[in-house]
């Protein structure tokens, strides 16, 4: 989706009459020096590191907008799911994944890791439920590992899975979603509190995009629209995170 983020950054720059620079961070969000030192104005970020950063640097960041995806499953709301996938030939239910190999993108991912921990905790399965747990580095790689049979299952951001199925429709013959965890607040665009006075203007620009952004980049990304969100909207993610940590589900496997 970096191509889409570039499109949004270009649109903001053109609309505001400023030069924009977008980079893909190589750091864990919780250790990103630019983020921690308030050197980033606007960021696209997963909901879990966002709420965690608000504990580390309280008041420095605030949620601005979040996308509403086009698919009917999102019910015209800024939400998404964690889709649990298995190989199409495997007749698994979630409970059948006990002792199997689970693949996730990153331990800081809400959809790839945190929601799975919460699902195990809610069902009173142990943190050692999976026989083997492996990190892939990305949702796309997790999908590949399941297709290749290296992993039995993976937790995938539903919007990423939909995007991959559009780009590679043949994947539908190799994968099956056995359960969807959620809905959960959609990853937001956030801003530094230094820009708080401009937040309404930025929200208006993104929630009422020009034809080029709406018809090209947003349509291709299957985004129906952007809506304004508040930092408080992401509190449920932090509560789930706190619950799994307190219950001893910090590390799976």
Where are these regions (language model features)?
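A ligand-binding cleft/hinge motif common to bilobed small-molecule-binding domains
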Residues: 44-58, 121-122, 147, 152-172
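A short beta-strand-loop structural module common to alpha/beta enzyme folds
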Residues: 19-27
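Acidic, polar ligand-binding/catalytic clefts
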Residues: 34-96
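Bilobed "Venus flytrap"/periplasmic-binding protein-like clamshell domains
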Residues: 1-15, 25, 48, 76-143, ...
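An extracytoplasmic/periplasmic, membrane-proximal ligand-sensing/linker region
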Residues: 2-3, 7, 184, 191, ...
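Periplasmic-binding protein-like
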Residues: 66-83, 169-204, 223-233
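Short hydrophobic/aromatic-enriched beta-strand-loop microsegments
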Residues: 61-66, 129, 154, 174-177
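Short, hydrophobic alpha-helical packing/hinge segments within bilobed ligand-binding/sensory domains
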Residues: 30-34, 49-50, 141-145
